[in-house]
Amino acid sequence: MTDGDTSPAHTRPDAFGRVRHLHFVGIGGAGMGGIAEVLHNLGFTVTGSDLRENAITRRLAGLGVQVVFGHEADHVQGADAVVVSSAVQADNPEVQAAREYRIPVVRRAEMLAELMRFRYGIAVAGTHGKTTTTSLVASVLAEGGLDPTYVIGGRLNSSASHARLGSGRYLVAEADESDASFLHLKPMMAVVTNIDADHLETYGGDFDQLRHTFDEFLHHLPFYGLAVLCHDDPVLRDLGPEIARQVRSYGFAEDADLRAVDIEQSGRRTRFTVVDGEATFPVEVNLPGRHNVQNALAAIAVARELHVDVAAIQRALQRFQGIGRRFQDHGTLRFGDARVTLVDDYGHHPREIAATLRAVRDGWPGRRVLVVFQPHRYSRTRDLFEDFARVLSEADALLVTEVYAAGEPPVAGATGRGLCAAIRARGQVNPVFVETLEELQQVLPGVARDGDLVLTLGAGSIGGAAAELARRHGVEDGG
């Protein structure tokens, strides 16, 4: 494929005309903080505000970005543009002040699209796996000497960051379908991992509308662009022939362009053989589960298209250090005489939970799996209630907390307690309802048994609770 001049030198402060000072409202969000860091490193004046301090705001402050807490109208003074995420409401005082002062208000995805306009953009979309896949793509391209810029929705453990400004011509970015904002992006290459029923509130509850939006996203590719699609996903398999662009498929299916065979998992490491036409080569990825084999295949497909050599691909996948809250190993915990392994994962959709549970069963056969699940959003709990009840029934022991609302009003019946009742009625496992995460700290030690693998799951505050459990009860190896 060919493209125009995408030299990083073109993304200078003068590339945005008169705009030199960018103010981020909600700068502590994963997607926002990453873009802010890249723009700061490009030489723009970046400021931001958020409700409270977190790891992202601390990192940005350490880089020299001015971050304030609370939202006040005078925070936007001096800004040439104000960047907001979809979580920021129109009545936010900083947004209102920006409009009053005629300061442009730009959505996060629009700003990402502007960064992508000056580089060879590689956008990774999909309902599940996009953060891991984006991270793998960035890691493989970096190992191949391409030094990409990346903006990721999770924190790469290798760099302790969501973003990095590289000297190369490639920008690897996670593309968010949850609010349809990925339609702002116009990449040269697009990866789609899967299309599943989630965030349907954005699409009027209509899955066909969600599917159509992914179709539209793929047609934002230039006529010489490339769509990299998972051939194992039935929706993408059907959608592929409709895409009037070059398509490269990957997966386990025999008719995929790039596929994995001879898959073996041991603990968190997975080995397989890549078949790419007449070429075959072995790979070991430092991630567990067949779903992560698919994510690795997507990264390999991108790397092969950009002529990264096989040895670099193999090194990057073998050395991959993972992402925060994606099967994050917190090590051994001790509750009295019981010693358990604690793993924390962002999985919050039935399909993600099923994939993670399968990875645990395959990598740690014979271990009792104690799941601690925090449902995320009342709307998702309502829409996928029976699917949640079915997949969570596969745990050997189960604790369920109240729903993490994420700003949503309660929905009758779509509660943690209601989910426990539905799971109990299935008769496979007897769940324990835990009202709060503070209560979890007291209840879990009494439920855990020696040798358990404790798996905390959810997209809300459960990750912080897992870290607190590790802080209170963690032991050194051999301790």
Curated annotation (Swiss-Prot):
Q: In which pathway does it act?
A: Cell wall biogenesis; peptidoglycan biosynthesis
What catalytic activity does the UniProt entry give for this protein? UDP-N-acetyl-alpha-D-muramate + L-alanine + ATP = UDP-N-acetyl-alpha-D-muramoyl-L-alanine + ADP + phosphate + H(+)
The molecular function terms in GO held by this entry are:
ATP binding; UDP-N-acetylmuramate-L-alanine ligase activity
User: Which EC number applies?
Assistant: 6.3.2.8
- The enzyme class is ligase
Q: Which Pfam families match?
A: Mur_ligase, Mur_ligase_C, Mur_ligase_M
The record's Gene Ontology cellular component field reads:
cytoplasm
> Which residues, by range, are in coiled-coil regions?
none
Q: Name one GO biological process term.
A: cell wall organization
Q: Which UniProt keywords apply?
A: ATP-binding, Cell cycle, Cell division, Cell shape, Cell wall biogenesis/degradation, Cytoplasm, Ligase, Nucleotide-binding, Peptidoglycan synthesis
Compartments where found: Cytoplasm
Q: Does the keyword Cell cycle apply?
A: yes
Which residues take part in binding ATP?
A: G126, T127, H128, G129, K130, T131, T132
Family of this protein: Belongs to the MurCDEF family.
Q: What does this protein do?
A: Cell wall formation.
**What protein name does the entry list?**
UDP-N-acetylmuramate--L-alanine ligase
